[in-house]
Amino acid sequence: MKQSLTSKIVTSVLCFVCHSKYEKSATRSNTLANKTNNKKSYFHPIGFRTERIKCGECYLEKISPNKNVSKKAIFHIHGGSFKVKLTDFYRRESVYYSRLFNNATVYNVDYRVYPDVRFPIPLDDVYNCYLSVIKNENANNIVVIGDSCGANMAVSLCMKLRDNSKPLPSSVILFSFWGDLSNSGSSYKENCHRDPFYGIPKRISYEDAKDKIHRITLYAQGEDLYNPYLSPCFGSFADFPKTILVCGSADLGQSDSFTAYEKLKSEGVETYLFDYENMFHDFQMLKFLPESRNVFKRIKDIIQP
């Protein structure tokens, strides 16, 4: 799909705002994460109810429509660089997913985050929550959705389920898959000036900012970055469920989606890759963009409610 005029304008504005404040981006990101994590203001919309369920050392939030039509159940793993808790924004996303799939029940994983914990605890939380969900839901009806680091854990979850002979979900949807925490794919250089959120201003060269672009998140500090449960791009995708990957050609981590797609195809897995021209990391969150509307229509056509 050719990039829309709307998204061109949005991308230009985001690049101007984010790149002009690049030097302070890490500090602002951490400050925003702390503010967001401490915010408690969510009210579920009319027609839905929310139940917060203790699951080991973390929580599941079950969002149920009052009129449940779909047999599907959404297992939602939010993003946020492993340092943002389940927020109001992601709760609203989950309501959107419920409506997209004809009033499906959604399970949001409120996993523990950095700096309180590090790898592998968030993945363990996700794994334990999934096992709790399949006590009441048929795994054949479950769709796992994750974005960015949530997509990372969605893939790691499937690997861990497979490795432990547990039931896998029916399908997986990955938005802006961050699957290589060594950040060694080709797009980390090629798109370093194009991604509004994780890229760098054009006034700074790739070589001068190489350490920041190939940053090692503190979540994984001291770990083997080639561990498939941490960087699933380096793992096996054998026996995976149907998988949809969504990325943009301006996303810093675009190559991670390409790597996963090629591995899935080589294993004979039913897989789809939707790569949108000049689109940025997690663009689908801006629902007014024509590209976002397009990709959700394609997803719905593939995964019938």
Task: List each model region and its residues.
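Alpha/beta-hydrolase superfamily serine-hydrolase fold, recognizing
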Residues: 9, 17-18, 51, 55-305
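A glycine/proline-hinged amphipathic helix-loop "lid/cap" segment
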Residues: 1-65
